[in-house]
Amino acid sequence: MLMLLCIIATVIPFSLVEGRKGCWADPTPPGKECLYGKEIHGGRNLGIHYIFTSKFTRICCQALECQYWGLCRFKDVWCGQSVSGVPIKANALLWGQRDVEPIMRCYDSRGAGAYYSFTVQVVPIEDR
């Protein structure tokens, strides 16, 4: 029981961050940066899931990843369309820096532009 309480106490701080951000995907790659609007603290063994939805068309997205030693860069996270509005949860990216704002950038592969929304979740990850 004590072990279960310790696990719960460890996992609870890594919960879904409040709020959802919405942006328009550009018609050309890589897309305009869509800022989350809030800095999210990271750490050596933390990762971030970007959870996003685009109901209207096929989009390709990149999301910001920040390594512990200071390098932040965009990584490809998805090309596709969420089916029936079910959110897409990208694989966890490294989130090692403090005071960094999550950023996504997407483009509509058909060139028409599309609306998407996203939120983030910080999670513990294994050393890489």
UniProtKB/Swiss-Prot annotation:
Entry GO CC: extracellular region
Keyword annotations from UniProtKB, A to Z: Secreted, Signal
Lineage: Eukaryota, Metazoa, Spiralia, Lophotrochozoa, Mollusca
Cellular localization per UniProt: Secreted
Protein name, per record: Insoluble matrix shell protein 3
Stretch forming the signal peptide: 1-19
Tissue spec: Component of the acid-insoluble organic matrix of the calcified shell.
